Amino acid sequence: MPVFALLALVAYSVSLALIVPGLLQKNGGWRRMAIISAVIALVCHAIALEARILPDGDSGQNLSLLNVGSLVSLMICTVMTIVASRNRGWLLLPIVYAFALINLALATFMPNEYITHLEATPGMLVHIGLSLFSYATLIIAALYALQLAWIDYQLKNKKLAFNQEMPPLMSIERKMFHITQIGVVLLTLTLCTGLFYMHNLFSMENIDKAVLSIVAWFVYIVLLWGHYHEGWRGRRVVWFNVAGAVILTLAYFGSRIVQQLIS
């Protein structure tokens, strides 16, 4: 029985239940309890995932689609929990915790295998590590873009009043672009290590991943150029950011999903 996975699922659920009162009330007690529950969930999630990705013995690493998705969600949740502990980014927590809960549940109760042996190819280990960090970073940037769009829409339609709990739009936009820049640097390193260490990068098996990753990189470069040189703001930067995240998701997971559906 995956005890730590079940504990993580319960802790994520408790944290989600506590986030709503934490958003509606200024009492910090709800928020502290939500953060404590989230930390418990993250620790249990990490232990459960370690057991799934690194099984006993020299049997390699199980980098199945669900395991990788759960690992990415763990990385995103860890970053957003740290941000929330500083009383920022609370509007995004229900999304990231629900995403992590669903990913972990699927990885636990619908297990599958995709065994690799990264210990024999350290270059590939670096490449995969960079790809995970770049993807998680750019997904967080996309979440900030969605938060920016939502608050902007609510204010323009007079559905949301200004209050001390709501972050300024300019502050969210600055953070979004700062995170996007970090993600683009990591994505650039990912593409470079792929060229060096993946000898079959442009084979039939990997051509879709390579092309879509390059397209996503180009979208982000255009976004940053448009913002810093042409002054792009508002909906345009949101659409570019979300489009880049969608294309990158298709690059990282699209072919694996199709392969598993076929098999």
Swiss-Prot record:
One GO cellular component term of this record is: plasma membrane
Q: Which UniProt keywords apply?
A: Cell inner membrane, Cell membrane, Membrane, Transmembrane, Transmembrane helix
Q: Which residues lie on this side of the membrane: Periplasmic?
A: 1-3, 55-63, 110-123, 202-210, 260-263
Residues annotated as coiled-coil are none
- GO biological process terms held by the UniProt record: cytochrome complex assembly
Q: Where is it mostly found?
A: membrane
Would I find Cell membrane among this entry's keywords? yes
- What residue ranges are annotated as transmembrane? 4-23, 35-54, 64-83, 90-109, 124-146, 182-201, 211-228, 237-259
A single MF term (Gene Ontology): heme binding
Q: Which domain of life is it from?
A: Bacteria
| Cytoplasmic topological domain residue ranges | 24-34, 84-89, 147-181, 229-236
Entry's localization field: Cell inner membrane
Q: How does it sit in the membrane?
A: Multi-pass membrane protein
Query: Is the Cell membrane keyword given for this protein?
Result: yes
| Protein name as catalogued | Inner membrane protein YpjD
Write down the species. Answer: Escherichia coli (strain K12)
